[in-house]
């Protein structure tokens, strides 16, 4: 299974949505001497996402060396071998467009002709991507969401997921809390499931933070606005917080369409809504300036938001859904409150804001203890064991 000198040839195919956890993993695998070729799919709807901030889409469909068409990738040259990074560029955003269907056929052939040891995917194949199943023994799938989020379900996506879980022999879950329920619900044999974790989102440390101007202390929600994230509960909780701590602001930063009437909240002088893509430098500035972060999710798996915040030493108030209560240790690195409970969320925010000694102790614990456990070397080793497993 190995190439010369026990080096593996790994093709890693992903999307910008996972760049903040893909980049450090791929960099670590490359540093270990493996031939890792990273392919990232970019379209109009994904060109500004997590670490990727591409202002203008290259106007042709095809497979290209990343730096040939997007100079923005040069920002990551210090921790990725950019000569091994390629863009799967989609001029047309419709996945059923004939040009995109043909591109996926070309991509599968392109991968197979390289004769890799492993083809690592981060999303279940759909449409003509299902040709990947011709090489099913080489496939590894990272299952970022063992269960689909509320509001994100559709029959085609679920059908594609079920096919992937049936056909792909190695499936990596990023927390242990949901593995039994996942295996039972999707009828996945235990020996097909490998447990790993997210590490420190170290890429944000390489970016110069843009100072965030605020004349009041503030707490921060950041990320894409989608229904499962429970922003409406946070806004209602903030009304109660404001009655006791009128100086405290809430900043909600992220693109996406609001799924409830946001207009009444825009009128509140203690709520600042920034409804657009937030670049990494801008986010770093917000995180360095905030009191702490909040994840009021209604349901979840694990969350890259927590990894990003902790990388910069920022404690979190989170709800007890998915594996968030595993990622955040209650009273140690943050607080865990009940989901969809305005009172409990408000009480958690007020408790942490009012206790500066506790908040500072959490910051210290994150910097001195959490980071010890979140290096990518051991995570990369776990992936290699998965790849090598017969």
Predicted regions and their residues:
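A short, well-ordered alpha-helix in the C-terminal region of glycosyltransferases
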Residues: 217, 247, 344, 351, ...
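Conserved acidic donor-binding segment of nucleotide-sugar-dependent glycosyltransferases
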Residues: 273, 330-331, 335-342, 349-356
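A short, active-site helix/loop in glycosyltransferases that binds the activated sugar's phosphate group
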Residues: 168-193
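Conserved donor-binding/catalytic core segment of Leloir-type glycosyltransferases
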Residues: 212-229, 235-238
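Acidic donor-binding loop of glycosyltransferase active sites
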Residues: 285-302, 314
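Nucleotide-activated donor-binding/catalytic signature segment of Leloir-type glycosyltransferases, i.e.
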Residues: 261-284
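Acidic anion/phosphate-binding donor-loop and adjacent secondary structure
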Residues: 34, 152-153, 183-184, 191-216, ...
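Short acidic/histidine- and often glycine-rich active-site loop of Leloir-type glycosyltransferases
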Residues: 308, 321-331, 335-336
